[in-house]
Amino acid sequence: MFKLRKAIGIMAATNEGIIAKGNALPWNYPEELDHFRSTTDGHTIIMGRKTYEALPEGIFSSRKAIIFSKNPKELEAKPGIFVKSLEEYFYIINGLDKDEKIFMIGGGKIAHLFLKHQLISSFILTRIHRSYSGDTYLDLKHFKGWRETVLKTNSNYTILQLTNM
């Protein structure tokens, strides 16, 4: 029997919950991406297939990647560990070092899956101040009642540490 390990969520969203448009970020804030890179560097990242396909391959050189996909065989030639279900995911993370940080990085379907099943211990959410159009959302209602701590703020965004109470 193993203890269920929870992930740390890390994503950016507008106040309306927009996280992507056409499998890409609708904004360009290099400092915010640097924060993502430095926070997740050297750790395990979890994502859905669309997020995986949108990321540059170089990101996987310093991170272990677990990718949810309905058809993992299609992606086997690429770097990463591919899973079809939460059960397969639990098996994989049970084999990781107990001190290994695990970050759930999106997209929308995976974020909602992890939040619905309470698989997130805390969430680093960058709130983008400007409105953008998009086609992928993060339902920010999931964070109602979570404690917010401001990590950084500037004119373009605020980085929050959200803790589930």
Residue spans for each PLM region:
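Enzymes that bind and transform nitrogen-containing heteroaromatic metabolites
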Residues: 2-165
